Amino acid sequence: MVEPKYKRILIKLSGEALAGDKGVGINIQTVQKMAEEIKEVHDLGIEIALVIGGGNLWRGEPAAEAGMDRVQADYTGMLGTVMNALVMADSLQRVGVDTRVQTAIAMQQVAEPYIRGRALRHLQKGRIVIFGAGIGSPYFSTDTTAALRAAEIEADAILMAKNGVDGVYNADPKKDKTAVKFDELTHRDVISKGLRIMDSTASTLSMDNDIDLVVFNMNEAGNIKRVVFGEQIGTTVSNNL
């Protein structure tokens, strides 16, 4: 049997991905399909953590621009990520995958607090861990959460599962028909070229901690498995190219 390229991964999902075609709210059938895709990889013995954005329920920056206090707006967004985490955890449990939600803001009735050692033990025991509530502080995105948690759990790679986007381009392919897709980039290329795969804090964290980043289209069945086994799909960002 072919050995996987990545044995411990952190999958970063946008909140909008949970909304399906509507783009807002949560579509349970869409989440269930994602859970089945994730289970397929989990059943191969891959250790999996998840970070899910909250943009399907709330976006802090526009609220702040409209006059809301930025700190309060960001905390509201963190609660949205917990809602998404709980829904995904339920879907994973329903397909037979033992799952734990850990939050950076304590809410004992619904989730465990984030404790690195406990998260690592869950992964080692074959449980999926979903990290909610960002890093618990305003002004930090869920991309930064993904990079930080990936470093803390010593993940081999962050899988940026995009909704209908099959990689990183030098221009917006929806607006520019001449846009060229990159198969590979270094983290330094991403930062120097200003490619907005993640925010700059997340990109720097990934580079400094030598974590591969794979940007791929999550809408094509089997793509998570393909990435894990090293097939060339999407765009791979690494220090080692």
Curated annotation (Swiss-Prot):
- Binding positions (ATP): 12-15, 55, 59, 163, 169, 172
The record's keywords, sorted A to Z, are: Allosteric enzyme, ATP-binding, Cytoplasm, Kinase, Nucleotide-binding, Pyrimidine biosynthesis, Transferase
GO BP of this protein: 'de novo' CTP biosynthetic process; UDP biosynthetic process
GO molecular function: any one? ATP binding
Q: How does it assemble?
A: Homohexamer.
Q: Which family does it belong to?
A: Belongs to the UMP kinase family.
Record-given protein name: Uridylate kinase
